[in-house]
Amino acid sequence: DESLDNIVRSYIKEKYKKPGDVFLGVVHRLDRPVSGCVVYARTSKALSRLSELFRTRDVKKTYWAIVTDRPPSEEGVLSNWLKKNEQQNKSYVYDKEVKGSKLAELSYLVLARSEKYYLLEVDLRTGRHHQIRAQLAAAKCPIKGDLKYGAPRSNEGGGISLHSRKVTFMHPVKNEEISVVAPLPEDRIWKLFSNV
């Protein structure tokens, strides 16, 4: 299973006819079972500038999630404390601060529903380990296929129904808004919501 980094590095080498090793700066990552937008930098200067935008939260990340149960309301804000368990590679949700926890906030909106599922648009206000997965599970609407966080069944292929739909930021030099939108995965569950 070739890594996304290697695929992008090969693409840059071919597209820009780069001899030798190609610089590729990883600006941020997605959890392995998550699909969608990932931002890379082709130069060290771009990496520094883009990393600063992500560090200062001057980037808007919008996710789409298919959940198995009705969310608490049609739209809302989830605010909890998350604590990461390194051994289990899992985050636990608390209603109040506990030692080692960090505040986690996201907003969500129900975009559509099918007979069995709900499509949510999720905007992160903070960026914590497994934040969307843990908070939606704690709200009793786990992401489809996410066994780690309480989904009843896995998805075909092992992924989860969480998709980094859009990443928006200001170009660090041109001061123009950049929006990167990822097409939805080509599987039957996402096709239920292809008209959204």
Predicted regions and their residues:
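RNA pseudouridine synthases
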Residues: 1-196
